[in-house]
């Protein structure tokens, strides 16, 4: 995930999909909202874009949350490539991600979905 982020310039969230409760919504961090960044402790996410599940925040552009972090026992990954500045290069970064996952962790049953303001649909990478 970090390699793809460095190479593409996109902020990328990586989560253990089995730890996410319900669906995800993108919102804005609130003053005083409790958020524990992986290896960083409690963070102030006020004003930052934040993905939330049915429990609390799970990801911001600067850090993912301890509760939904990827571990050695993770078997289902949710990876979000945030194209805040537009779609240019997003498909290439997604394809590179899938390539790495298949090559180095023997990923199977990989599904990708492009979600934009204008439309939403499954894509093949």
Segment roles from a protein language model:
Residues 1-125:
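RNA/tRNA-interacting regions in translation and RNA-turnover enzymes
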């Amino acid at each position: 995930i970090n390699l793809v982020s460095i190479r593409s310039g996109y902020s990328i969230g990586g989560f253990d999909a089995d730890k996410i409760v319900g669906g995800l919504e993108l919102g804005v961090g609130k003053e005083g909202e409790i958020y524990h960044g992986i290896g960083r402790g409690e963070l102030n996410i006020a004003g930052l874009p934040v993905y939330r599940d049915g429990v609390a925040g799970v990801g911001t552009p600067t850090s993912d949350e301890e509760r939904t972090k990827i571990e050695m026992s993770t078997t289902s990954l949710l990876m979000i490539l945030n194209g805040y500045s537009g779609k240019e290069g997003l498909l290439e970064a997604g394809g590179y991600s899938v390539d790495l996952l298949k090559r180095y962790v023997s990923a199977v049953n990989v599904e990708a979905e492009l979600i934009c303001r204008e439309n939403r649909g499954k894509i093949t990478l």
